[in-house]
From Swiss-Prot:
Gene Ontology process terms (BP): D-xylose metabolic process
Subunit structure comment from the entry: Homotetramer.
Cofactor(s) listed in the protein's UniProt record: Mg(2+)
Name of the featured protein: Xylose isomerase
Residues where Mg(2+) 2 binds: 267, 270, 306, 308
Keywords: Carbohydrate metabolism, Cytoplasm, Isomerase, Magnesium, Metal-binding, Xylose metabolism
Subcellular location(s) of the protein: Cytoplasm
Catalysed transformations (reactions): alpha-D-xylose = alpha-D-xylulofuranose
Similarity section: Belongs to the xylose isomerase family.
Organism expressing this protein natively: Brucella abortus (strain 2308)
Amino acid sequence: MSTGFFGDIQKVRYEGPESDNPLAFRHYNADEIVLGKRMEDHLRFAVAYWHSFAWEGGDPFGGRTFDRPWFSNEIDAAKLKADVAFEFFSLLGAPYYCFHDADVRPEGRNFAENTRYLNEIVDIFEKKQAETGMKLLWGTANLFSNRRYMAGAATNPDPDVFAFAAATVKTCIDATKRLGGENYVLWGGREGYETLLNTDLSRELDHMGRFLSLVVEYKHKIGFKGTILIEPKPQEPTKHQYDYDVATVYGFLKRYGLENEVKVNIEQGHAILAGHSFEHELALARTLGIFGSIDMNRNDYQSGWDTDQFPNNVPEMALAYYQVLLAGGFTTGGTNFDAKLRRQSLDPQDLLIGHIGGMDCCARGLKAAARMLEDGALSKPLDERYAGWNGEFGKRLLSGLSLDQIAGEVEAKDINPQPKSGRQEYLENIVNRYV
């Protein structure tokens, strides 16, 4: 049954590259076969409940700009929000969604009331998933918005806050499991510090390690088959976050013996904030064996903060999905649009148009990446660049020869290497041919 929020808008369909219909896909064709698999199964698109239905359009200098009928802290409003959200999911045709607990339920007076509200909404979600075929990519807990978390959740100096946060995560994992969620995400929005003057760094890292260990232990205890994911971000809202980037998260996981239990959910905007390219973070996660899922958005490259805009740069998407394909593609992960409308984009159809454009951009990037992979456009030059290591001397350097033996061979054979071109411009031109 329609809520009426989206008026007479019909289900979004693929119309091909020549279409000028803003409410149709031009490049995303769910059933198109790419590298032997349906495009939908490659991309595994998800809608973010928080930016799409909970964000009010505020910024640091101004309040709410969106006028939505569900904007109140009442359970009936939360139910209306669920109706509108699932209507949107059906119109768009993305197969997955994601949520924080605080996105979907009212804020209660205490933990028990929060849990009751969450369970009431999960009852509704179960029915709607059965009716629509929608699936949950991942669930998570909001451990950063409420003032109790102003000094962190897992890293809070108050053990009562740690306990409240842990109990909240337990209920959110339960909800995620019940809804068939394929992952559970932890984003440490306030797991960091503003100043070292009031921060015990060693204690806070140990507490965060303990918290994550409890999550992993509970996952196995209840038989949750999904993947536990950490989402790196360098700062904002804190000055310095402990899950700064992929490399930092991997070091943290190794320190606490969790590198085989936890993977990463990499957001493009967070990679940019950390001073990296998106493909760098994806490539490093793949190399370290912790690649899990992605949050797809972009930042404004001039503003210096997290703007969470829909992707619109096909070359960037091509290089990103090239790394995803090199990793073997998604298993439990997917492409979650952690992107929000601009605060002046007030119309309901703007929400559809933003997602349609993002999905088309990702589809173009995926197809370009697949062609580069099939043609060996980047892999062949890379193999040539490192070919020397496949020879007898290269293999001996990596196993068998000691430092003094290497020095002896260099002198005896008069090894005097000459530099070779890295051919960067050539490779960049190759990428541009595909996009």
